[in-house]
Curated annotation (Swiss-Prot):
Family per record: Belongs to the class I-like SAM-binding methyltransferase superfamily. TrmB family.
Native organism: Streptococcus suis (strain 05ZYH33)
UniProt GO cellular component terms: tRNA methyltransferase complex
Entry-linked NCBIfam families: PRK00121.2-2, tRNA (guanosine(46)-N7)-methyltransferase TrmB
Region Interaction with RNA, residue ranges: 124-129
Underlying gene: trmB
The reaction(s) this protein catalyses: guanosine(46) in tRNA + S-adenosyl-L-methionine = N(7)-methylguanosine(46) in tRNA + S-adenosyl-L-homocysteine
Protein name as annotated: tRNA (guanine-N(7)-)-methyltransferase
Annotated pathway: tRNA modification; N(7)-methylguanine-tRNA biosynthesis
């Protein structure tokens, strides 16, 4: 979902290089050095306003997190959260999810999150869905052997499509939630959309899929 442009967003991102990486191509293969440790690295593709990735970073200080979003304004709101939290284990990137191999070396990322991605419901837009085969090819390259994707959505159609896409790719569906909030998940960190939709009584779907 597009948001109204935010005045000063570009300057805000540029003025906080400790969190916002402006030259991600130069970081490929060097993320442990950038974080200053060898802790696992988890990324969220389509991090929106940053509630999930910031919450995860606060909850798991021994894991490094990278929030990725192509929209400058949205990323600037994520930066607001990061600055308020003051956490050392989080970075932000303004890049496209289809180009991740330009910024991460093979197996450099330990886990990947997709939360409430655009469902692109029209058939002609299938290739834009973040669980389409070409995206899975990209994710597999930067994740380790048996690396995992954790996926959440309120959209039943996208969820069913994604389950089929993961399965057709040869991934193992380790765990599937057809009603996340009814079934419960210890340590679940909600996104902005997740709270909004669940408050309206909408079901939240989740799956943990593992490459083979």
């Amino acid at each position: 979902m597009r948001v109204r442009n935010r005045k000063g967003a570009s300057e805000l991102l540029a003025n906080n290089p400790q969190y916002v990486i402006s030259n991600p191509e130069e970081c490929k293969g060097k993320w442990a050095e950038i974080f200053g440790n060898n802790n696992p690295i988890h990324i969220e593709v389509g991090s929106g306003k940053g509630r999930f990735v910031t919450g995860m970073a606060a909850q798991n200080p021994d894991i490094n997190y990278i929030g990725i979003d192509i929209q400058m304004t949205v990323l600037s709101y994520a930066l607001d959260r990061v600055l308020e939290a003051g956490l050392p284990n989080i970075k932000l990137l303004q890049v496209d999810g289809s180009s991740l191999t330009n910024y991460f070396a093979p197996a450099e990322i330990d886990q990947l999150y997709l939360n409430f991605s655009d469902p692109w419901p029209k058939k002609r837009h299938e290739k834009r869905r973040l669980t389409y085969k070409s995206f899975l090819d990209t994710y597999k390259e930067i994740l380790p052997e048996k690396g995992e994707i954790h996926f959440k959505t309120d959209n039943r159609g996208l969820f069913e499509y994604s389950l089929a896409s993961f399965s057709q790719y040869g991934m193992v569906l380790k765990q599937v939630w057809l009603d996340l909030h009814a079934d419960g998940l210890e340590g679940n960190v909600m996104t902005e959309y997740e709270e909004k939709f669940s408050n309206k009584g909408q079901v939240i779907y989740r799956v943990e899929a593992q490459f083979q």
